[in-house]
Amino acid sequence: MNNKHQALPEHELLTHKSFIRNLNLFDWAFALLIAIGAFIAQTQAGLHMDIYEMVILWASAGIAVFLGWFFKPMRWFIPLGVCLAYLAVDLYGGDIKHADGFLLKYLLSSQSAIMWQCAMIFAALFAYACGSLLAAHKKSQTNTLLGIGTAFGWISALAGFTGLLVRWHESYLLLGDAGHIPVSNLYEVFILFLVISSLMYWYYETRFTVQRLGVFVYTLMAGIVCFVLWYSLARNAQQIQPLIPALQSWWMKIHVPANFIGYGAFCMAAMLGVAQLMVIRSTEKGKASRLPDSATIEEIMYKAIAVGFLFFTIATILGALWAKAAWGGYWSWDPKEVWALVVWLNYATWLHLRLVVGWRGKILAWWAIIGLFITAFAFVGVNMFLSGLHSYGGL
């Protein structure tokens, strides 16, 4: 292999040599483990699943395998989260009354796991902030505190992932056949958002070695945690409720997660935009910035927006198909649909200006930041201030 290929990140080598041939024994063992897990899940819950849910189960297993092959740390993250959730299921023993047991009450019930997720996000932010200050003082790119911040971020994602899986099981314990995937209200989807954001940042931090950007990403995530806590207290949103008729569809299981991969990527890009503006400002003043260089930050921001745009596009298409099944038409110019289109056009334009026109620097950073407010209004603001077919998601 020539030097050009050696310099490429691992996943970019896919275009130069066979992806399958580069898989090792651990990769195939991971794939087998996921397949066995999916088979056990279908065996135990198959009587309660229709054909669409079985397709979603095996598609999810395939996605999990690809994630583990593409980003190696996922090979332990996914099995560990599933094992912790399965332990919680076993501790429940089919009866929600067992929630008072020590492990469930303080660690593994959905509420306990999610509270640990929230606590670890604040801990990660504190560690990243202290680590960034220490790195600036010692003029280094990494240190123990930044590593601790990364570890806390991993734990937060694992706790949130486990909490969502356990909450799914708890919904069946509480509601019987009316149990459902935990993406039915703002509380649940924000927990999903936090998990996705943590994992996405984890990937980019690992690939680009940019631990000092963690303070920007986790500042936004900590703000969202504050909102989740307020929302839980104000609306008792942590309580599991039956699905309203409009959400009783298998489309929800794929539309909502795809949407929140997009939201997570867009929000991360906005915080990277803030970091890039700080670097540009320091450069313009002739000062050395302690953050990664502007080009590196912009490259991560671009990749985040590209991934977010892809999944947001998929989610929008899935939403149109769901609308056809639910309301008889693919598009009705409902406020939520209109603002989804605004979000899509905003990031389509951003990508066009960067890839085709060749724009770089400050203007794209500002655009990404403004995009956060557009995305936030499309998700939360529309529900608060406008009415329409999607009003069931209101605050």
Locate predicted features:
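Hydrophobic cores of alpha-helical transmembrane segments in multi-pass integral membrane proteins
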Residues: 2-100, 109-240, 247, 251-281, ...
